[in-house]
């Protein structure tokens, strides 16, 4: 049965209005030059494909496998760069927040504040993000059932903010492995809010390389097609021009060269299933 989703605008992107949208960018703000290069490159591809686009990247990766893992440029410099991307590339920006104290500064720059999967039950963090008035993207924890995300939605809407996105990024399956139960996508969409499928994070192998996370990027196209076939509103992908040199999540990132042909296929699939949404 078709489900009515509450649409809203994120910058120039209409979320939940029936058109497939893309959230993409490098996992981490590695440098100003690289982040700008990726934002412009992905925007150009998205425009050619007619896919609305939101840039994503993190100023800090607080959840890393090892104490020696690169975390990023920090909140001050990272947000400065994200602000420049928003202005220079003309795209809406998404970034994650890890503590309520980070929300005010991040909300000055980002159009979307993302709640990381491991923090999706942290009430104070979600409430503070909701109070900012920005769109709140909550990633479903690897340990959480899809129907439990209704409680996360209510933490946002309790503050008078209806701008909520839910994102699926896989569930823990034994050690160092994630799987996706695609039944969760229509389940979460049944709450009446837009749902995004995070393709690349669901292909992580957390801690799978000992002191870093591995991944199975060879399956990105397969999983993306399956997710869009389930009727999601948007797809989330970490995209890098040289994943082997990426400072975070290289093994599960989509090479930039593979983005355009994938979007073409995803648009076709979405056009076939959207009338059933």
PLM regions and their residue ranges:
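N-terminal amphipathic alpha-helix/helix-capping segment at the start of soluble metabolic enzymes
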Residues: 1-22, 80, 271-277
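Active-site-adjacent loop and "lid" segments of alpha/beta metabolic enzymes
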Residues: 68-76, 112-119, 175-182, 203-228, ...
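Structural preference for beta-strand elements that scaffold enzyme active sites
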Residues: 19-23, 50-56, 92-94, 111-112, ...
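Alpha-helix-loop-beta-strand connector modules within alpha/beta enzyme cores
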Residues: 41-49, 68-94, 129-135, 185-195, ...
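Catalytic beta/alpha-barrel core
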Residues: 72-74, 88-102, 111-124, 135-146, ...
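Glycine-rich, proline-tolerant flexible connector loops at the mouths of alpha/beta enzymes
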Residues: 26-35, 53-75, 240-250
